[in-house]
């Protein structure tokens, strides 16, 4: 399996080992566009892997802070209570760059930037950039993708 993320179309495509499309999902990448620098709040390009899978068995809407469940489940009332929170929900696929000097090591390290593919709240619009660097998905879609891919799956982000 391989994950391809096309930034211009805001689509994530899961591809099998024979190159056939298994499934496509609408996503939301960074509102600042693409870029690899730490602190840019951009989505990094290039070849990555899924370094860690976080959230197995958690309920849909589980809120994560620093990759740990908070015990909260997202709803609109919680959203109103914490309007500026960066909502990381349901499941996390933590990415690691595979290209030293481009998206790995130093000031361009995807993993040290905490770039994930993760679930988003119901108010987040898919198909348009809106994150602060991560790839957001609908909660039902991240559960589906999470269950289909193992750690070390290749992720290609095209921008």
Feature map (PLM): residue ranges:
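Short, surface-exposed secondary-structure junctions/capping segments
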Residues: 35-53
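Exported/periplasmic cell-wall-interacting domains
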Residues: 60-159
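A structural motif detector for short, solvent-exposed N-terminal "entry" segments of globular domains
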Residues: 1-33
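Soluble periplasmic/extracytoplasmic beta-strand elements of cell-envelope proteins
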Residues: 4, 13, 49, 92-94, ...
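Extracytoplasmic
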Residues: 7-9, 22, 45, 88-90, ...
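Short, solvent-exposed loop/turn elements at domain surfaces
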Residues: 35-36, 58-61
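N-terminal post-signal-peptidase region of extra-cytosolic proteins
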Residues: 1, 26-40, 72-79
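Well-ordered beta-strand positions in beta-sheet-rich domains
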Residues: 24-26, 47, 114, 154
